[in-house]
């Protein structure tokens, strides 16, 4: 789940509680209109929200990583997964991968590379640069479902870690507050004793 997204909980008339998880938003990049339509269809069948672009340059514009010239410099833009073809004119899928991993806003977003060529050095190069997976075309529905499940598991784990971190911070803040209160109580008690002692000394002089 991307930062800022909310998991909706719906209670039907019968009283049974159901949890509706937000759909994954996938940015699909491919210069081939046929391949673009195929991956879009597979993603939609897998209940994903899909945005398609025809080049690496357009992908950078959509993500707002083109030096501020893009049309989607939106602070609330959420992309859960980027799927890109490797061989594209201009900016290749490999170059796009590097640009994404160099950015502060999208470096944590998983990137999957697609290619019709099974070239081992190319695959190793992409994985080394941080690609989540390297898929051979034609991409199958089973590939898309497997990737989706992997992303959802990763995001669920990240949410769990964030939740534990927040709980630990709250506990630490609570302990600090309690310690500060105890120190104040000790100081108040010490001050009261000192004032009582001074009063007794004054009365004894009188």
Swiss-Prot record:
Which top-rank group of organisms is this from? Eukaryota
Expression sites (tissue/organ): Predominantly expressed in roots and young flowers.
Q: Which InterPro entries match?
A: ARR-like (IPR045279), CheY-like_superfamily (IPR011006), Sig_transdc_resp-reg_receiver (IPR001789)
- Gene Ontology molecular function terms on file: phosphorelay response regulator activity
- Listed PANTHER family: TWO-COMPONENT RESPONSE REGULATOR (PTHR43874), TWO-COMPONENT RESPONSE REGULATOR ARR7 (PTHR43874:SF122)
Q: Name one GO biological process term.
A: response to cytokinin
Q: Does the keyword Transmembrane helix apply?
A: no
Q: What does this protein do?
A: Functions as a response regulator involved in His-to-Asp phosphorelay signal transduction system. Phosphorylation of the Asp residue in the receiver domain activates the ability of the protein to promote the transcription of target genes. Type-A response regulators seem to act as negative regulators of the cytokinin signaling.
Name any GO cellular component annotation: nucleus
* Compartment annotation: Nucleus
Q: How is it modified after translation?
A: Two-component system major event consists of a His-to-Asp phosphorelay between a sensor histidine kinase (HK) and a response regulator (RR). In plants, the His-to-Asp phosphorelay involves an additional intermediate named Histidine-containing phosphotransfer protein (HPt). This multistep phosphorelay consists of a His-Asp-His-Asp sequential transfer of a phosphate group between first a His and an Asp of the HK protein, followed by the transfer to a conserved His of the HPt protein and finally the transfer to an Asp in the receiver domain of the RR protein.
**What keywords would UniProt list here?**
Cytokinin signaling pathway, Nucleus, Phosphoprotein, Transcription, Transcription regulation, Two-component regulatory system
Please report which protein family the annotation says this sequence is part of: Belongs to the ARR family. Type-A subfamily.
What is the organism of origin for this protein?
Arabidopsis thaliana
Task: List each copy of the Response regulatory domain by range.
Answer: 25-152
Ranges for region Disordered? 165-206
Question: What are the 4-aspartylphosphate sites (modified residues) in this protein?
Answer: 85
- Which SMART domains does this UniProt record tie to the protein? REC (SM00448)
Official protein name in the record: Two-component response regulator ARR7
List the signal peptide residues: none
What upregulates it?
By cytokinins (BA and zeatin) and nitrate.
Q: Name one Pfam family in it.
A: Response_reg
């Amino acid at each position: 789940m991307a930062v800022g997204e909310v998991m909706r909980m719906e209670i039907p008339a019968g009283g049974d509680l159901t949890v509706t998880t937000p759909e994954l938003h996938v940015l699909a990049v491919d210069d081939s209109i046929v391949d673009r339509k195929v991956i879009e269809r597979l993603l939609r069948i897998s209940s994903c929200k899909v945005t398609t672009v025809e080049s690496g340059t357009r992908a950078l514009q959509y993500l707002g990583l083109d030096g501020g010239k893009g049309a989607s410099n939106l602070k609330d833009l959420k992309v859960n997964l980027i799927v890109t073809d490797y061989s594209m004119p201009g900016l290749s899928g490999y170059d796009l991968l590097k640009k994404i991993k160099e950015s502060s806003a999208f470096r944590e977003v998983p990137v999957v590379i697609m290619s019709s060529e099974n070239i081992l050095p190319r695959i190793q190069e992409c994985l080394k640069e941080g690609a989540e997976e390297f898929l051979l075309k034609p991409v199958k529905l089973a590939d898309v479902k497997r990737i989706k499940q992997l992303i959802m598991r990763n995001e669920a784990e990240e949410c769990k870690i964030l939740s534990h971190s927040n709980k630990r911070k709250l506990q630490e803040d609570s302990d600090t507050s309690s310690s500060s209160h105890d120190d104040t109580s000790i100081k108040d008690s010490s001050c009261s004793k000192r004032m009582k002692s001074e009063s007794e000394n004054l009365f004894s002089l009188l």
